[in-house]
């Protein structure tokens, strides 16, 4: 919403007509082709799957606010942290998510961005120590393995937020899995 408002302000500021701005907004489709990794919503066997590239506490707060407005019987999240962030920022992401999701899958990907093996995962786990909602935490090595584990657990009516790291590759993997085992997005 904030990005759309900024775009409207910029368009108005350079003198575009309101009708042109309105048509531009009306034509925007938030899918993996037009805005990869930006709240891409898909259906997988009757469950809602959302792929997003958020990797900081502000993004987690915005994502939690958005998914709180969506139906979801059981809520799960798949997350890895970007190793080039401050320890507190990595930890705070799962502090926020731990209050909004029943199941959390932590994954470590190949690119740790200067961190030692397991260091980012440990910080994410620390953030879940006082989780008010999370009941199940799993740790998995590999982004696609984590995505597959999350998809396998989904039941109709569930909601799963997947915080992707390798955006294009993860979206292609999700698309393939959806075409193989569920309804298309």
Each PLM stretch: what is its role?
Residues 1-5:
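Short, conserved micro-motifs enriched in small and acidic residues
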